[in-house]
Amino acid sequence: MLLSCRHGASSPKLDNLVPSGKMKILLVFLGLLCYSAAMPMQMPRMPGFSSKSEEMMRYGHFNFMNAPHMAHLGTLYGNGMQLPQFFPQYQMPMWPQPPPNKKHPQKPSASKQQSKTDPAPESQKPNQPQPKTPTPKQPLNEPSPTPTQPEEETQTPQAFPPFGNGLFPYQQPLWHVPHRIPPGYGRPPTSNEEGGNPYFGFFGYHGFGGRPPYYSEEMFEQDFEKPKEKDPPKTETPATEPSVNTTVPETNSTQPNAPNPRGNDTSPTGTSGQGPNPRSNPTGQNGPAVNVSGQGVPRSQSPWGPRQTIIHENYPNPNIRGFPARRQWRPPGPAMGHRRNGPFYRNQQIQRGPRWNSFTLEGKQAVRPGYPTYRRVYGSTARSNPPNYAGNSANLRRKPEGPNKNPMVTNVAPPGPKHGTVDQNENIQNPREKQVSQKERTVVPTRDPSGPWRNSQDYGINKSNYKLPQPEDNMLVPNFNSIDQRENSYYPRGESKRAPNSDGQTQTQIIPKGIVLEPRRIPYESETNQPELKHSAYQPVYTEGIPSPAKEHFPAGRNTWNQQEISPPFKEDPGRQEEHLPHLSHGSRVHVYYPDYNPYDPRENSPYLRSNTWYERDDSPNTMGQPENPHYPMNTPDPKETIPYNEEDPIDPTGDEHFPGQSRWDMEELSFKEDPTVRHYEGEQYTSNQPKEYLPYSLDNPSKPREDFLYGEFYPWNPEENFPSYNTAPTVSSPVESRGYYANNAVGQEESTMFPSWSSWDPRIQAQGQKEGRPYLNRNFWDQSTNLYKTPTSSPHQKENQPYSNNSPAGLQKNPTWHEGENLNYGMQITRLNSPERDHLAFPDLIPPDYPGGQKESHVFHLSQRGPCCAGGSMWPKNNPLALQDYTQSFGLAPGENPDTSIGYAEDSHIKYARQTVSPTSIVPGQRNSSEKILPGESQNPSPFKDDVSTLRRSTPCSVKSQLSQRGIMPLPEANSLQSKNTPCLTSDLGGDGNNVLEQIFEGNQLNERTVDLTPEQLVFGTPDKEPRPEGIPNEMQGNESERQQQRQSSILQLPCFGSKLANYHTSSIGTPSSLGRQDSFDGDPIMPTETPNSLAGLATGAQFQNINVDPLNEDEHTPFDSLQIGTNPQDQVQDCLLLQA
C-alpha cells in the first residue's frame, strides 16, 4: 500500500507510463515490490535461507526460525527448552545481521522477520532488484515501520530485556507465537513440554508454510501489534495494573506466600534467569509491568488488555478468590499433581506460556530427575498439550471470550499481576507447590467436592477455569484435583470415560475438551506416554493418589508402582480398573504410570493393568486366557494390537496414540480389563512387540524407553526393581509377559521376573505365578496363549500345552508369537536376534534394549549389547559365557578368557543367574549358535536329544538348562525361580528353543515334542532339575550330541547366532547344552560358525568341549566349557550373526 501510495504520488508518471506499457511493468514491479516487502518475511526468508533451508528449518537450519516451533518439537525430540534459548542466541547473530542490512532498523517494527527476511533477500537479491527494492522498501517500511519501530525498539528492550533487540525479534515471535497461538497452546517456545503443542508444534512444524505465514502474519502483526500491545499494555499497565494491582494485592497476598520472592525477582531473574521463563516470566517480569512488558502477558494482554481489564474487573474476585485459590490450586496441582497438575493446570494457564514456562522450570525442578523433565516435555506434550492445546485451545476456542477471556486473562492477567505469583508459584512452585501444595492440597480436598469439577474439569477445567472465574477457582482446584484426580482418579479421563462428571460438565467443556479429554484421557490412559514422561514425574505422584504431595515423589509413585505393580494395588486394581475411572487414576494412571514407565512396560502397565488384568485374569482364566490369548495370540490381536501399539509406539512419543492406546488401556481396562484389548494396547505394546513391536516397543519405544528409561530406569528398575533384570526382560522381553507374565510375574514374581513369561515354565509360574496368583495366567498365558499363540507354531506345543512351561518354552518369551513363528518367527527372530535390532526384536522380550540396564536384566537383556547380531553374551556382562560371547562377538574376546570365568559362572549360580539373566541373550547367541549348530543335530535328532535337550533348552530357555543344570538349579523352587528366569533366558536356551524353533522351523514338530517332553518338568524341574545337570539328560544329549553335531553341521547356518551358542549350551547337556551344541560344532567342527569358535574354542575349550560333549562325564566340564565355549563362540556367534544377518 505504501508503495502504491508512494508511487501513487507519481501517478502522472504512472499514467505516462501506462500508455507505454511501462505502467504494467511498474505495477508489476510495484506489486512484486510490495509483495517482496510483505513477503520477504516469508519468501526472502525461505530464499534468503533458501527454501531448502526453510525445509531444513524443521531440522533447525533456521533453528531460530523454528525455535518457537522447534522449541515444542525440539522438546518432543529432546531439544527441549534449550532450543529456544539456543535459538535466541543463534538469533542474536542472525538479527544483528539484519540490522546491518539497514532494514533491521526499519523492519524491527515492520517485521523483524522482514528485516531478517528482507536482509536475506537483500543479500540474495542485492544484485539488481534489491537496490531498487530496498529503496522502495525502505521508504515503504520507513513511513510506518519506523514509527512502529521506535515503539517496538523501545518495547523490545522492555519486552525482552534479556534478549535485546537482536533476539527480541524472535523472542517476540516466540512470545507472540506462544501467546498468539491460542493462549491455550501455551507458549510453544517455552511450551517445550507443551512443546507438545501438537497443534502448535505441528503447526509450526509442518506449518513451515504456516510458520513463515505465522511469522509473516504474526511477526508482522506482532510488530504492529506489539506496539499496540505495548501501547495498550502501557496504557493498560496503569489501567490493568490497577486492576492487576487490585488483583496483585491479592496476588501479592499470594505472591508473598511463595511467589513474592520471585514476584518481582521473577521479572528480572525469572526472565533472565529462567530459561523458558524469560518467555513466560517476561509476563511475570513486570508483575504489574507485565502489561507493560507486553511480552508474554502483554502479548496476551494486547488481546487481553481489554480482557485483562475486564478480567481484572471480573478477575479481582477470581483473582481474589479464584486467583489466589486458583494459584494455590495451581500449586496444589504442582504440589499434588506437581508436574502433572502443574502441566495441566499450569499448562492450562500457562497456555499463555508464562505458567507453562514456570511449569517448565518448575516441572524441570519438580521433575528434577531430568527425564521427568523429558517426561514433562513429552508427557506435557501429550498431556499438557491436550489440555493446553486441546483443552486450552478448546477453552479458548470454545470460550474464547467470556470465561475463556476472563479465565484466560485470569490465567494471563493473574500471570500478569500474579504472573510473578504464578510464575513464582510455578517458579517457586516446587517450594510453593509444596507449600501451597499442602494447604492447597488441603484445599484441593475442599475442592474435592468439585471432584466432578476436577474430573470434568480435568480437561474441561481449562474450560471450566476459563468458563468461570470463580469456578475457575474451583476449577483450578479441580484442575489440580482433576489433575490430581486425573492423577488420582487418573483422570477424569476415566471419569470422562465414565463421562458422568467429566463428560457431563466436561463435555460441555469436552467439545474441545472431549477432544482434549479423550486425547488427554487417552493420554492419561495413554499417560503411559505422557506420564511416562510425567508418570514418573508426577503421575506416579498421582498414581498412588493425588491426595498426598508425597505422591509427587515418583519414588512414591514408583513405590506405588512397585506396590501396585507388585502388590495388591494391582489386584486391587482390577477393582480399580473397574474403578478405573477414579482409580484409573491409580489403576489407569498407574496404568498410565505404568505406561509412563511402561508404555512399553505395558507389562508394567499391564502389570498394573495387567496386574489388574492379570489378577483379574487370575481371577478369571478366561479373561486371562482370552486376553492372554490375545495377549499371546497377540499374533491374533497382534494386527490390532500391533497396529495400536505401533500407533502408540510412534505416536506414543506424542502421547497422542497413547491417548488412544491408553484410552484403550484405561477404557478397556476400565471397560472390562479385557486385557485382550488392553493387551491390544499392552498387547500392542507387547503383542506387537513380541516379535515385531516388541522390538518396536523395545526399540521403537526406545524413545519411550527413554521416557521409559526415565521410567525404565525409573520405573522398570525401580518399580520393577524387584527384578530389574526381569523387569527389563519383561519390559522389553515380554510384551505379553511384561503384560501378563512379566507384568504379573515381574510384579508378582521376581523369580518369574526374569522369565515370568518364560515362566511360562508354568511350574514356576504355578509356583511363582501362583504365588503371584497368576500362575495360570502364565499357564493360560503360555498354555492358552501358547496354545492359541503357539498353536499355530506348536500344535505339538499344544499337546505340550499341558506343561505351560512347555508352551512357555515354546512361546518361551511369549515366544508363542516367536515360537508360533517358532519355526519362522524364531528363525526369523533369531535372525532378528542375529541382527542387533533383531536381537532386540527376537529378544526384545528377554532383552529389552530399552532397558538394557534393567539392572538384573541389564545383564540379561541389556546385552542388547548382545553384541553384533546375536550378542547373546553381551547380556552377560556378568561373567556370562553369553556375555562374553556378546562381548566376545563385539570384541572378539578370547572365548575362553571370560568364558572361563563365565564357565565357572555358568556352572556357578552367578553365571547361572547371569546366564539365566543373560539367557535371553544366551538364547540369542546360544540359540543362534545352538540353532545353527545344534539345530541340525536337533532337527535330525529331534526326538531323544532334541526333545530332551531341546525341550530342556526350550524348557530351560537358555542357559537356564546349562545354568540351572550346572548351577544345580534343578531344585524345582530354584529351578523354577531360576529356570523361570533362565527359562526366559532360555529363550536364549531357546538356543535349545531356538534350535527347537529352528528345528521346528526345520523339523516342525520336534521342538514342540522336545518342549512337550521336557518343558513342564524338565524345564521347571527336571531338565536342569537333574542335578547332574547335563549328566542325566546330557548323556542322552551327548549321545544325541554326536548325531546332533553331525546333523547340526548341515543346519548350522540357520540359527547361527541364536541357537548356536545356547544350543551348544543345551547340546552339551541340559546343564551345558551350549557346550554340547558348541562342542558338537567344536567337536565335529561340523558347524561353520563353530570353525571360528573352534579356532577359539579350538583352544582348550574347543577340545575340551569336544571331549566333554562326547562324554557325559564331562558334562560339568561342558558347563564351564559351555560357558567358555559360549564365550569362545562369540566369534562363532559373530559369524553366526553374520550368517543369520546375511
Curated annotation (Swiss-Prot):
Tissue specificity comment: Expressed by secretory-phase ameloblasts. Intact enamelin and large-molecular-weight enamelins are limited to the most superficial layer of the developing enamel matrix, while low-molecular-weight enamelins are observed in deeper enamelin. Preferential localization among the crystallites in rod and interrod enamel.
Predominant location of this chain? secreted
**Keyword line:** Biomineralization, Extracellular matrix, Glycoprotein, Hydroxylation, Phosphoprotein, Secreted, Signal
Q: Where in the cell is it found?
A: Secreted, Extracellular space, Extracellular matrix
Q: Which residues form the propeptide?
A: 277-514, 666-669
Q: Please list which residues make up the signal peptide.
A: 1-38
Which residues are recorded as modified (Hydroxyproline)? 547
According to its UniProt entry, one GO biological process term is: biomineral tissue development
Q: Which cysteines are joined by disulfide bonds?
A: none
Q: Where is the composition biased (Basic and acidic residues)?
A: 223-234, 431-442, 570-582
For molecular function, the Gene Ontology terms on record are:
structural constituent of tooth enamel
PTM annotation (Phosphoserine): residues:
53, 191, 216
Q: Which InterPro entries match?
A: Enamelin
According to the UniProt record, where is the region Disordered?
A: 90-347, 374-513, 543-587, 603-662, 787-820, 921-965, 1020-1049
Q: Which domain of life is it from?
A: Eukaryota
> Glycosylated where?
245, 252, 264, 291, 462, 929, 1040
Post-translational modification (record): Proteolytically cleaved into several smaller polypeptides. Cleavage of N-terminal region of enamelin occurs soon after secretion.
**Function field:** Involved in the mineralization and structural organization of enamel. Involved in the extension of enamel during the secretory stage of dental enamel formation.
Name it.
Enamelin
Q: What is the lineage of its organism?
A: Eukaryota, Metazoa, Chordata, Craniata, Vertebrata
Q: Which gene encodes it?
A: ENAM
